[in-house]
Curated annotation (Swiss-Prot):
Family per similarity comment: Belongs to the HAD-like hydrolase superfamily. CbbY/CbbZ/Gph/YieH family.
GO annotation, cellular component aspect: cytosol
Catalytic activity: 2-phosphoglycolate + H2O = glycolate + phosphate
Keyword Magnesium: yes
Organism this protein belongs to: Pseudomonas fluorescens (strain Pf0-1)
Binding residues for Mg(2+): 19, 21, 182
Catalytic site positions: 19 (nucleophile)
Protein name: Phosphoglycolate phosphatase
PANTHER family: PHOSPHOGLYCOLATE PHOSPHATASE (PTHR43434:SF1)
Name of the top EC class for this enzyme: hydrolase
Pathway terms, separated by semicolons: Organic acid metabolism; glycolate biosynthesis; glycolate from 2-phosphoglycolate: step 1/1
Job of this protein: Specifically catalyzes the dephosphorylation of 2-phosphoglycolate. Is involved in the dissimilation of the intracellular 2-phosphoglycolate formed during the DNA repair of 3'-phosphoglycolate ends, a major class of DNA lesions induced by oxidative stress.
Domain of life: Bacteria
């Protein structure tokens, strides 16, 4: 039985919200290269890709602080040093995304959902300046009507503000929505928003199995959401989706737009 059949018997969700890094794309090679360039420029030893793989998931500022600390706990890192290091990292990371790849099954799944008329959004803790160009480079940006970066709103995951925002903008309730991610932050945000959550086992999650975070469902291939797509005789052969008409234009949510809806969103503000 497919993931959708288990989570939404007899129907499909009307809205699917996705995380980005560790869910749709493997960006760690580029992130690790930027982290190592940053550390070398500061006279430090490089961290290496495996360490960076365990540090990602909470946004660039936290990644940089973990790199400076050499581990998950970054409480001892000096704020001034971290701010300077972040500037160095952002410049290094913005220079290249050549090592980033889309995970197997992602394009097939997005294409299938688009064909079924399911609305899709992207909610990531990655700084918004990198998100749209990266999606375009990976050729998957056209599938998302709402794109929210980690610095778009005042809050980022695990706060559910972005999920509430997208559901408000789409007019689709939590009961007909789904969040797909790979980390504890994703699961906590989905639970706080009252949304079912699919956890992907191949993601990052700081080196811990995603099942430990108790998402609604755990899968190891995004195509397992789709009824019958991974049956022995099944094969997805969908044509490329047409560009969205102007009435369904992609919305890259910016800080200016956020200020216009802050009053509507405030009543959903999550308090830990």
């Amino acid at each position: 039985m497919s993931g959708f059949e288990q989570l939404f018997p007899g129907q499909l969700p009307r809205l699917v919200m996705f995380d980005l890094d560790g869910t749709l794309i493997d960006s760690v090679p580029d992130l690790a290269a930027a982290v190592d360039n940053m550390l070398l420029s500061l006279g430090r030893k490089p961290a290496g890709i495996e360490s960076v793989r365990e540090w990602v998931g909470n946004g660039a500022p936290v990644l940089v602080r973990r790199a400076l600390a050499g581990g998950i706990d970054h409480s001892s890192v000096d704020d001034v040093e971290a701010e300077h290091a972040l500037e160095v990292f952002m410049e290094a990371y913005g220079a290249s995304h050549e090592l980033t790849v889309v995970y197997p099954g992602v394009r097939d799944t997005l294409k299938w959902l688009h064909k079924q008329g399911v609305a899709m959004a992207l909610i990531t803790n990655k700084p918004e300046r990198f998100v749209a160009p990266l999606l375009d480079q990976m050729k998957i940006g056209r599938y998302f009507k709402w794109i929210i970066g980690g610095d778009t709103l005042p809050q980022k995951k695990p706060d559910p503000a972005a999920l509430f925002f997208v559901m408000k903008m789409s007019g689709i309730p939590a009961s007909q929505s789904l969040f797909v991610g790979d980390s504890r932050s994703d699961v906590l945000a989905a639970k706080a928003a009252g949304v079912k959550c699919v956890g992907l086992s191949y993601g990052y999650n700081h080196g811990r199995p995603i099942a430990e975070e108790s998402p609604t469902l755990v899968i190891d291939d995004l195509r397992k959401l789709i009824p019958g797509c991974l049956d022995t005789a099944a094969e997805i052969t969908l044509p490329d989706a047409a560009q969205s008409p102007s009435g369904n234009a992609i919305v890259v949510v910016t800080r200016k737009l956020w200020m216009k809806v802050i009053k509507a969103l405030a009543r959903w503000r999550w308090r830990a």
